[in-house]
Each structure stands twice: as C-alpha cells, then as structure tokens.
C-alpha cells in the first residue's frame, strides 16, 4: 500500500466528547468518525484493524468446528414474543413497525432467530452437535452511549450458537468454544482473563466472560494471584470472614448516635472498628392485591450489597429497594437508623454469611439518633436466614482455598454461556432422540465484540504519542518512511525495493510517499500505532544502513540495508507466533 493512494485522516486534537483514551486515539488516528450518538463510520485505517480481528476470529471458529452463516439484522417481533424477551428486554431493544403495521426489532442478539433455524432444520440427534456462527452488525439502544466503540449503540459482533442432544455434548461444545476464545485473545496479543460470570439478560446456567485487563475497565474482576480462580465481582463467591461465632461478651445497650446515620460515622463515634457495625438495607417484593413483603438484608459495615446474588434468592427475583414511606411504615424511622431489633411490623431478615458469624455488633435502633450495641444472635435476635449477598473485597479468602482475592479492572470482550433448554423449550426446538422421542435441544451461546476489541486493545496499549498495536491487529505491520522520496533516486529506489521485498514476504507494509516532513510522518504513524518503522535516508544509505525503530522501542537502531526487510519480517513473524 502506498500512502499517497490511501486515506489518512489523522487529527491533532481529540473531540470534546471523547472521555477515554481509546475514544480519543481512535478519532485522532483516523479510525472512526461519529455519525450519531453511539454510531460511527469506520474509516479505512479502522476497517483494516476490524478485518484483522474478524480474520482471527473466523479462523479459530472454523478450527473449532463452527459453521458460518448470516442472519438478518431485522427480526420479527413474533420470535421475541415466543421466547418471552419482547416484554423482558426493555428499551435497549429497538422496535419499529413496517408499512403494514407489523412489529420488528433491530437485533441486539440472535438467540431467537437461530432457535427458529434449528427447530426448522434439525430433526434428529444424528444432526448434532452443530455450532453456527456469524459476524454481523448489532444494535442496542443504550440509554447513554459513551466511550466511543466501548459502549456504542451499533457494533460488530461474532455470535455463535451450539446445539446438542444432551448435557455431555453441551459441556463439550462449551469447552471447545472456551478453548477457541483463549486462542483468539492470545493471537490478538492481549493480556486477558477468563472469569466466571452471571448470565445476565441472555439467561442460562453457566457462563464465563473474557476480559482485557486495563486500568480504565468498567468491570471489577476478583482473582487469586496464586491460583487459577477469577470471576466477575458480581459472580464471585464471598466466603464468611469469621470462621466461628464467638460467645457474647457484651450486654445489649441502646446508645445515642446523634446525626450519625452512616456506619463509618457510628464506628468513629463509638470508637469501634467499622467491621463491628451492620449496614441494614431494606428491599421489597410486590404482591398483587396485597401489601409488599419487606426484607431486611444485613451486611457488615464495610461491605457492599450484590444485587445479582440477592435476585437469585427464593422470593427475591423481582425485588426493589423499599421506598422511604414503606421504611417508615415497617420500621418506624427513616433510613439511617434501621435494624432488626424491634421493628414496627414483621420483616424477613437475611444476614450475609459474615454477619451470621458476628458477635457483639452494632445495629440501628429504629429510632432517629440511636443505635443498639452489643447485639448477638440467639440471645437478642433469632437465628437469621443466611446467604451470600455481598461483593468480595481485596484480601478476602479465595473461594478455591488457594490464597486471597485481589481486584483488577477489565473490559469485557467475549462471553460464553450454557443456555440449556431456555430457548428451545420456549420456542419448541425439539429433536427425535435414539428412541424416537422428542427432546428439547441443549443450547450454548458464544459472543465476541469485534469492534469493542479495538477499543479494549488501545486501552491496554498506548503511550503519549498514540496507539501501540499488537502486530496481529495493526492496520499495517510496518511503515517505510523515506527521507526525500520525490527528490532522491537512491532513497526512492531503496524504498521501492524494500517495499517489494516485504510484500513478497507476506508483510502488511505501507510506504509513505506523501512527501511530508519527517516530523509529520513520524507523528502520524506513531499516532496510528504501526508496530515497526524503517527510515530510509541518503546519509544512512551511503553507509549501507537503514534506521529501524519498534513502536515500543525508546531508541532507533541501524540495520544493514540489504538485510533490513528480512530482519523486520522475522521480528513480525516472531511476534505473531507468540
């Protein structure tokens, strides 16, 4: 590729609405341009990287036995009504009517369509296992699109769907996809972790997320540095921090805590550790035609509620936070001084695992400006229902028993689910088993955010000059920067020869023949993030040398002119083989 025949749309300044590094650099490097909120044009530089991501994803999906197809972006509402997600999905699902007043959606995902294909095409157990995948544009009407391609409304995604006759087959399909994802993200040159996760709106029983590790990541990941344990903080099991409950050592006592509505303030006033205070959270579940059920969830003062865990408890799937009016009605006091002792009306109490093992703790007195100290289970309160309802913290014991938890930030770029029969039962996707009886197909779902990978890769690989692409997804692997290409026959002939040698070696090279000043050339290609650069100048050529600098190198080095192409080609091949 010659730069004079290519579009390079670099900018010196980032747009005012760009909040994170990847958004700023993708705009400045001429990769994307905004069309509307969360919707982007992908310019030639950006599209080259997208195509490289797609190629790696496609190769590994094919290697794992995936079969590519293409489903429509527009889907009829009837399919979503069959699955039940027409009502469940919410405003993120973009709905519209055609001229005949039929309801349609722009697909954010394709479980319904692929299940429709399967129920019409797969009739026998002999046709399974099968795994269909596509690489296609999706749309989710995010309430607040931001961060460029990281949280856009329109995006490119690879989604795959497996169909099996039994649980053993589903487990094998899941393992193949998990292994394929490990290969994909390894080949992309990214530091990543696979973490146990919640299945979210997709549904299902078992899932893992693949996260690119980055300080700017939206998701908190709990992991153990001394073992293989890793989980999204929403899904990580929180073990009790107290192995055995101590015997009571204090009498229960009502204490004045004027104006101290927070656990931290109460602990400071009473000169006790925060870990001895209790955070009381009031939830409600609605009952048709009757008053709501009120739940008091008790956490240690330094812990945070995990709503996803709560929603999986019996009776709490559709919980909400209680209103202040409800809190006053059941507890006789506004929030800030709530507790399980002496409630105005009966409530259901759930204690976190750690709280259940505490002694001599402090709770709200259900009276403004008062708390109760020295509270103990069994003596002052009945034994509670116990559940894991909190987020893990750094320093907690690892659930696998092999160390302690640490927390890092990650950007989700892939997700694998075991859906089971969620969609096949809802939509009647059955097959005839070995005995001729109809059975629901067992499904798996496997997604990779193609365009999101670009943003995540940049968040992990950049400096003050611009992007630092891994070789596998760089728009170009090497750039040739000739000094005076249009003025020096020696420079032009050498640059053209190097270009031909690199092309012949299968290297993705661009020759900058625009006639720009060296500073402009270097700034453009450092901003765009090309991993390798060769500078061809008359002075060096007279000594038989060409200047080489890797994008991560602090200094340039000199290479023999006749070996420069082979040397750089070998560096690129070695990087791609890692």
From Swiss-Prot:
PANTHER family: MITOCHONDRIAL RIBOSOME PROTEIN L39/PROLYL-TRNA LIGASE FAMILY MEMBER, PROLINE--TRNA LIGASE. Consists of three domains: the N-terminal catalytic domain, the editing domain and the C-terminal anticodon-binding domain. Belongs to the class-II aminoacyl-tRNA synthetase family. ProS type 1 subfamily. It holds the Pfam family HGTP_anticodon. GO terms for cellular component: cytosol. It comes from the Bacteria. InterPro entries: aa-tRNA-synt_IIb, aa-tRNA-synth_II, aa-tRNA-synth_II/BPL/LPL, Anticodon-bd, Anticodon-bd_dom_sf, Pro-tRNA-ligase_IIa, Pro-tRNA-synth_IIa_bac-type, Pro-tRNA-Synthase_IIa_type1. Keywords: Aminoacyl-tRNA synthetase, ATP-binding, Cytoplasm, Ligase, Nucleotide-binding, Protein biosynthesis. It comes from Burkholderia lata (strain ATCC 17760 / DSM 23089 / LMG 22485 / NCIMB 9086 / R18194 / 383). This is Proline--tRNA ligase. Signal peptide: none annotated. Catalyzes the attachment of proline to tRNA(Pro) in a two-step reaction: proline is first activated by ATP to form Pro-AMP and then transferred to the acceptor end of tRNA(Pro). As ProRS can inadvertently accommodate and process non-cognate amino acids such as alanine and cysteine, to avoid such errors it has two additional distinct editing activities against alanine. One activity is designated as 'pretransfer' editing and involves the tRNA(Pro)-independent hydrolysis of activated Ala-AMP.
């Amino acid at each position: 590729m010659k730069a004079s025949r290519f579009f390079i749309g670099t900018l010196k300044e980032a747009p005012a609405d760009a909040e994170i590094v990847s958004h700023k650099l993708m705009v400045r490097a001429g990769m994307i341009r905004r069309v509307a909120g969360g919707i982007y044009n992908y310019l030639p530089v950006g599209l080259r990287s997208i195509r490289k991501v797609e190629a790696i994803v496609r190769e590994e999906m094919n290697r794992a036995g995936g079969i590519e197809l293409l489903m429509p972006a527009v889907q009829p509402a009837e399919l979503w009504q069959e699955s039940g997600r027409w009502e469940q999905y919410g405003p993120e699902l973009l709905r519209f009517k055609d001229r005949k007043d039929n309801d349609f959606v722009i697909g954010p995902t394709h479980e319904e369509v692929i299940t429709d294909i399967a129920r019409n095409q797969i009739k026998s157990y002999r046709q399974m296992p099968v795994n269909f995948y596509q690489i296609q544009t999706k749309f989710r009407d995010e309430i607040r699109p931001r961060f460029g391609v990281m949280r856009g409304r329109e995006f490119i995604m690879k989604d795959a769907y497996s169909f099996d006759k039994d649980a053993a087959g589903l487990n094998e399909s899941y393992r193949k996809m998990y292994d394929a994802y490990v290969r994909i993200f390894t080949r992309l040159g990214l530091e990543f972790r696979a973490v146990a996760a919640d299945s979210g709106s997709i549904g299902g029983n078992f899932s893992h997320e693949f996260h690119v590790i980055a300080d700017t990541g939206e998701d908190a990941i709990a992991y153990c540095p001394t073992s293989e344990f890793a989980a999204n903080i929403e899904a990580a099991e929180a073990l009790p921090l107290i192995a055995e409950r101590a015997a009571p050592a204090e009498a229960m006592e009502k204490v004045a805590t004027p104006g101290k509505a927070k656990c931290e303030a109460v602990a400071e006033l009473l000169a006790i550790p925060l870990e001895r205070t209790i955070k009381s959270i009031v939830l409600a579940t609605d009952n048709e035609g009757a008053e709501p059920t009120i739940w008091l969830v008790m956490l240690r003062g330094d812990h945070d509620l995990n709503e996803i865990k709560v929603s999986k408890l019996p009776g709490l799937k559709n919980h909400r936070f209680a209103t202040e009016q409800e809190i006053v009605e059941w507890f006789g006091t506004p929030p800030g001084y709530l507790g399980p002792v002496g409630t105005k009306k009966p409530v259901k109490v759930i204690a976190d695992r750690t709280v259940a093992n505490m002694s001599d703790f402090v709770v709200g007195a259900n009276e403004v400006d008062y708390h109760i100290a020295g509270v103990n289970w069994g003596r002052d309160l009945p034994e509670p229902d116990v559940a894991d309802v909190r987020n893990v913290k750094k320093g907690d014991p690892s659930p696998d028993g092999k160390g302690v938890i640490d927390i890092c930030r990650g950007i989700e770029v892939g997700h694998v689910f075991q859906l089971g029969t969620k969609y096949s039962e809802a939509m009647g996707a059955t097959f005839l088993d070995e005995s001729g009886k109809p059975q629901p197909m067992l499904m798996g779902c496997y997604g990779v955010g193609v365009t999101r990978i670009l943003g995540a890769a940049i968040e992990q690989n950049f400096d003050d000059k611009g992007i630092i692409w891994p070789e596998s997804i760089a728009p170009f692997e090497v750039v040739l920067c000739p000094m005076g290409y249009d003025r020096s026959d020696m420079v032009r002939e050498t640059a053209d020869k190097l270009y031909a040698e690199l092309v012949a070696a299968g290297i993705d090279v661009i020759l900058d023949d625009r006639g720009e000043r060296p500073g402009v050339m270097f700034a453009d290609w450092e901003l765009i993030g090309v991993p390798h650069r060769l500078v061809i100048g008359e002075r060096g050529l007279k000594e038989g040398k060409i200047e080489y600098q890797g994008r991560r190198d602090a200094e340039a080095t000199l290479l023999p002119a006749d070996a420069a192409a082979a040397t750089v080609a070998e560096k690129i091949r070695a990087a791609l083989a890692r």
